[in-house]
From Swiss-Prot:
Subcellular location: Host nucleus
Any further remark recorded for this protein: All late proteins expressed from the major late promoter are produced by alternative splicing and alternative polyadenylation of the same gene giving rise to non-overlapping ORFs. A leader sequence is present in the N-terminus of all these mRNAs and is recognized by the viral shutoff protein to provide expression although conventional translation via ribosome scanning from the cap has been shut off in the host cell.
Protein's name in the database: Packaging protein 3
Summary of the function given for this chain in its UniProt record: Involved in viral genome packaging through its interaction with packaging proteins 1 and 2.
Keyword annotations from UniProtKB, A to Z: Host nucleus, Late protein, Viral genome packaging, Viral release from host cell
Composition bias, Low complexity: 7-21
Keyword Transmembrane: no
Region feature (Disordered): 1-27
A GO cellular-component term linked to this record: host cell nucleus
């Protein structure tokens, strides 16, 4: 999946992967 979709839908990603994604979205 595209990186944009992964950021928009962090729920699909594993909890361990949600942390780095949120870190980029929420500084």
């Amino acid at each position: 999946m595209h990186p944009v979709l992964r950021q928009m839908r962090p729920q699909q990603q594993a909890p361990s992967q949600q942390q780095p994604q949120k870190a980029l979205l929420a500084p």
